[in-house]
UniProtKB/Swiss-Prot annotation:
This is Ribonuclease H. The lineage of its organism: Bacteria, Pseudomonadati, Pseudomonadota, Betaproteobacteria, Burkholderiales. It is found in: Cytoplasm. Mg(2+) 1 binds at D18, E56, D78. Keywords: Cytoplasm, Endonuclease, Hydrolase, Magnesium, Metal-binding, Nuclease. Pfam families: RNase_H. Monomer. Coiled coil: none annotated. SUPFAM superfamilies: Ribonuclease H-like (SSF53098).
């Protein structure tokens, strides 16, 4: 699966994603920051009962769904689960019928399968950033994810 950048004929979008959960499982939220030139869009959402990893994947799914056209995407996540899932594990999971190397069912397969359908629509370079380390894009995505959590707190 190619993860290089598209020629300049496609818009260049920088995306920062994050997921959060109060309890794991518990109320969770996801957030994403999408930047194109001087334009910036913030999106967030959540679920009443979920896990942090599910929210991390949802952040990427909803960010990619928010793109209106094929784009060259630079995607930043603080989730090694998401970054490695896409760049290292996904192809093997598909070849094994959504089983891990140890023959166990892939956790969150429903979301991984949905994400997999979106990947061919864009040329994405995947980047990991250390969370809660002062990176402005990641901090903003984290704040949006926590806003998503708050909407589902009792």
């Amino acid at each position: 699966m190619p993860h290089s950048k598209h020629p300049s004929s496609h818009p260049h979008i920088i995306i920062y994603t994050d997921g959060a959960c109060k309890g794991n499982p518990g109320p969770g939220g996801w957030g994403a920051v999408l930047r194109s030139g001087s334009h910036e869009k913030h999106i967030h959402g959540g679920e009443k009962l979920t896990t942090n990893n599910r929210m991390e994947i949802c952040a990427v799914i909803f960010a990619l769904k928010a793109l209106k056209q094929r784009s060259s995407v630079e995607l930043w996540t603080d989730s090694q689960y998401v970054q490695k899932g896409v760049t290292e594990w996904l192809e093997g999971w598909k070849k094994r019928g959504w089983k891990t190397a140890s023959k166990d069912p892939v956790k969150n397969a429903d979301l991984w399968q949905e994400l997999d359908t979106l990947l061919p629509d864009h040329d994405i370079s995947w980047h990991w950033v250390r969370g809660h380390n002062g990176h402005p894009g990641n901090e903003l995505a984290d704040a949006l994810a926590n806003k998503g959590v708050e909407e589902f707190l009792p």
